[in-house]
Amino acid sequence: MINKYTTQKILLVGANGYIGCRFLERCKDKYNIYSIDNLLKKNDLLPNINQIDYREMKINEINEFDICLWLAGHSSVPQSLADPEGCYDNNYSGLVNFMNMFKGKIIYASSASVYTSIAGAICDEDTTVGMPINIYDYTKISIDNYMSIMNKDFVSLRFGTVDGGSKHIREELLLNKMVKDALNENKIYLANPK
């Protein structure tokens, strides 16, 4: 969908987050990227990122872009449970409003959490999603369904747990927490050792 010879303009939403800042670091010199973030997590704003809430963008601003790479929103179940109204607004209703204005292609960060209720099954792209068991799952399933029903030009990336280095590391993720604990305390804590 995106290649290094493109003259297309890319809007990167969530550029200051865990995945967004790594994507921007790797691709900023190869593509025509305009990066934004609303600093929901109050991280320090990294260079080349504009502090803009996508929900405040006007239709003419949005449609200056050909492609939207959507890496924004409440990014975990714990964050979403702590702020369910914010999760719904950020992950669903705000995104629906944005998509209704945007005329280009959307590459969207969904989540493997859409399969949470399918216990023990191996899932692939053709697996039917399960019933949501929390607000995070609900917003991800709902936005996937909305884009399909509205015939939007989109790709939904259903990330599993992402780990690894980033300028804005997510310390609550299992592997990242284990590495941090091993380095800082010479111990690894198991949350559910049985």
What residue ranges belong to the model's regions?
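N-terminal Rossmann NAD(P)H-binding glycine-rich loop of SDR-like oxidoreductase domains
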Residues: 10-28
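SDR active-site strand-loop-helix element
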Residues: 13, 36, 68-72, 106-112, ...
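Conserved glycine-rich Rossmann-like NAD(P)H-binding loop of the short-chain dehydrogenase/reductase
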Residues: 32-42
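Rossmann-fold cofactor-recognition segment
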Residues: 46-59
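NAD(P)H-binding glycine-rich loop region in Rossmannoid oxidoreductase-like domains
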Residues: 58-90
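Conserved Rossmann-fold NAD(P)-dependent oxidoreductase catalytic core, especially the SDR/UDP-sugar
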Residues: 96-133
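NAD(P)-dependent short-chain dehydrogenase/reductase
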Residues: 133, 145-194
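Active-site helix of classical SDR
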Residues: 135, 139
